[in-house]
Amino acid sequence: MRAGRGTLGVCLASVKQSQGGDLDKLACGLKRRSEKRNPSPSDVPSWTDQPVADTHGKSRAMAAASSEMKRDQSKASLILHSGFKALQYLKESMGRNSTPAASLSMAVVLSSAPSEEHGAGVSGGIGDTLGSDWPAREPRTTDSCGQYLKGEAWVSGWQGHPKVREVGFLRGEPLSAVPKGLGTRSELSYCSELCQLPYTYPYYEALPEDKTRCVSLDHLSPVFSEETVEDEKTLSSTSDGLQIVMGLLALQSSRLTSL
């Protein structure tokens, strides 16, 4: 600094040289610039608007980097603004009554897919519990004697056996028609056939081999009661719901006695 070789000395020397050595003129220009917010370029020397280079010469690089960052920020803000506008438009379109059909259909598809899978699982569980021959189910395998193989539930495939299907409902009425193939539905409801099962299973092996003979309940005795006229009248006078409950109870008892 004393030798005039510092940064301040270099600046003063350059200013003095540009202004012809008149420092008072430079002070007057700076004063007018401070008084006026928008001074004319002629009043202020051009060197005041230029960044002063440091000892390492990094000012121009920093200025370029700063301008590049500003441009990137402006682009990012523009993208965010566009995305926000698109999101607002989507919310408004979903809130209006005139919602696009594509959005509704997509929402319905996404919401109905798990429901269909859940419903299929529930129906499959009901079919396995009742042992009914539901659609798309294959008949269970049996051995040569007609008995189900070890590990197979005997309830699961009883509906396809001809002897069981020939037995009439609680009053001994024969079936009006018997399907010819396995895996088909009977004309009777599943509840009616379920009530027949407790009566027929204890005599499953004793039934004759003639598949055309129609077996009546007069030749079979119920599992849970004696063969009397009073019991037959009681069964005939009860409602369908009570018959189903009694049939389910008999089904459990016959399954336990057969073990």
From Swiss-Prot:
Q: What are the disulphide bonds in this sequence?
A: none
The record, for Pfam families, names: FAM220 (PF15487)
Comp. bias regions, Polar residues:
39-49
Its principal location? nucleus
GO cellular component, alphabetical, reads: acrosomal vesicle; cytoplasm; nucleus
Tell me which InterPro entries the record gives. Answer: FAM220A (IPR040355), SIPAR (IPR029155)
Q: Which GO terms describe its biological process?
A: intracellular signal transduction; negative regulation of transcription by RNA polymerase II
Matches recorded under PANTHER family? PROTEIN FAM220A (PTHR31980:SF1)
Keyword tags: Cytoplasm, Cytoplasmic vesicle, Nucleus
The organism sits in which domain of life?
Eukaryota
A single GO molecular function term of this UniProt record: STAT family protein binding
Q: How does the record describe its quaternary structure?
A: Interacts with transcriptional activator STAT3; the interaction occurs in both the nucleus and the cytoplasm, is enhanced by IL6 and promotes STAT3 dephosphorylation, leading to negative regulation of STAT3 transcriptional activator activity. Can interact with both unphosphorylated and phosphorylated STAT3 but interacts preferentially with phosphorylated STAT3 in the nucleus. Interacts with protein phosphatase PTPN2/TC45; this promotes interaction of PTPN2 with STAT3, leading to dephosphorylation of STAT3 by PTPN2.
Q: What does this protein do?
A: Promotes dephosphorylation of transcriptional activator STAT3 by interacting with both STAT3 and protein phosphatase PTPN2. This promotes interaction of PTPN2 with STAT3 and mediates STAT3 dephosphorylation by PTPN2, leading to negative regulation of STAT3 transcriptional activator activity. May be required for spermiogenesis or sperm function.
Which locations, inside or outside the cell, does it occupy?
Nucleus; Cytoplasm; Cytoplasmic vesicle, Secretory vesicle, Acrosome
User: Per its record, how is this protein called by name?
Assistant: Protein FAM220A
Question: What's the name of its gene?
Answer: Fam220a
Keyword Protein transport in record: no
Q: Region entry Disordered: which residue ranges? A: 29-66
